[in-house]
Amino acid sequence: MFLSLLLWSLATYAQKPEHYYVRINTGKGEAILKLYNETPKHRNNFHKLVKEGFYDSLLFHRVIHNFMIQGGDPDSRYAADRVMLGNGGPDYKIPAEIQEGIIHRKGTIGAARDNNPAKQSSGSQFYLVQGRKFTDAGLDSLETFRLKGKKLTDLQRRTYKEIGGVPHLDGEYTVFGELISGIEVVDKIAAVKTDERDRPLVNERMAMKLLTRREAINLEREAQGLEPKSGFFTRLFDSLKSLDYKL
């Protein structure tokens, strides 16, 4: 019996989660972010920076209600009040990984960038989408005036009517993940008062931590309606093996 339990525990522990997950803590609450495997360069870069503690104590330095909240500028960690931010980051860019069908619906995370023809992303700056819901008439108007006649897909129209988001960013910026909990945190931060440069008048800081192998597996099991893995052997293997994992 003991041997059977041991072998079963070994087999289940050998399983890997399907995605990387990040816990984002803010003064307005906690959110859990899932990183997309369809955008591996952005996924791996964000995973690396979170693991290094890069984002801890940085500000959401640009906040626009019904649009997005932006952070990831390392210059924001010790920035004085009212100082303009948004130009800091690592000395590299990430090649664009813009995917058809991965769109700017509410709760997604996108990579910020400067104006460059290759649409390369900032090495660290990101935004969480709030956006808003649209009507058919509103989307028709967007197609005509903002998108210069480009037609939205059925998926885009349905998503932006039912969930909301920022459709005019589609195809221009890389979306590389989504919040699976804590979307209300985005709404709360997006509602704060800001200055003329869209910087919050009261600093909104962040801290990030990767979910462990066990936390990620249990999160995915819960999404499938399964019981979380627990018990003596699970705790034993967690203590003997690195809690981190690689995809």
Kindly give the residue locations of the regions a language model identified.
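Bacterial N-terminal signal peptides
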Residues: 1-9
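Cyclophilin-like peptidyl-prolyl cis-trans isomerases
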Residues: 12-247
